[in-house]
């Protein structure tokens, strides 16, 4: 069923598409916990399909008076997102928009809350800071969603306007820096395999090794989850190998700091015994001991540009589904040096 452009959709339209009574539609929207999950899903899908909005919000539909946007964050506790959110909030405030934050870490519990925000038109648009979206944007019945922009992550299959860096080249440069110092046994602590940016960073690492004629050693590639704990745990596994690495490239500063802590706990001197390089340049990276060499992402600019891109859509401008690529920089600090002879 196509979205009604000439007149606002009614509750009767929703009921017809969902195959339920108007009373059930009303009950689902007013008291969603009073109906079964199956019924709620049917009604929510129908609401999105026909473009229905509750009567008391209908006047705001055309005037776009919500003035709020939703930022969906993979993990609100990850310090990497702080500057991105600040960039979004400052750009939003300059244009009179309020920013709501949605933590996607507990996706199952949050899915209905996010869908409800869409249904009731309490947000005008969304900025996604990861590729793990808490609903299926590909479904035909959900084409009435508000404008969306993807920031930080790059997932071309979603066909969304995107602001991000070149993760593959940045990872290549980080690995090449270790090679230029003379390291040949370089390990990689990656992020989750499900995240496209981690796949690009891993490919950058692999390409750098191949370009230098070094072997790709499976035992040197190990997956983490962007936490200090995983960085420490996986560093211990790498450093207890029969032939441990002399350097570790981590997909995030948080994991790199965890790896540094573990290496020092095991009695290693940094960077003399082990070089470690991170990714992101979070605020604490320069204060670690030693200061962390890392790939600096322009986090504030990613957030600021993503909000400006969303504003273009909210103002009715046509926005390309392509990406806006920002520059990253390798910051060489004290956690890397040439290996011992």
Predicted regions and their residues:
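Flexible loop/turn connectors
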Residues: 236-341
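Flexible loop/hinge segments that line or gate small-molecule binding clefts
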Residues: 105-106, 128-173, 194, 214, ...
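N-terminal helix-turn-helix DNA-binding module of bacterial transcription factors
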Residues: 1-65, 337-340
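Hinge/beta->alpha junction and helix N-cap segments in small-molecule ligand-binding domains
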Residues: 74-83, 101-110, 163-173, 189-234, ...
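Short beta-strand segments enriched in small/hydrophobic residues
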Residues: 22-27, 61-77, 131, 177, ...
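Amphipathic helical "hinge" segments at domain boundaries
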Residues: 52-117, 121-125, 203
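Short acidic capping loops at alpha-helix termini that bridge into adjacent secondary structure
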Residues: 184-185, 216-220, 270-275
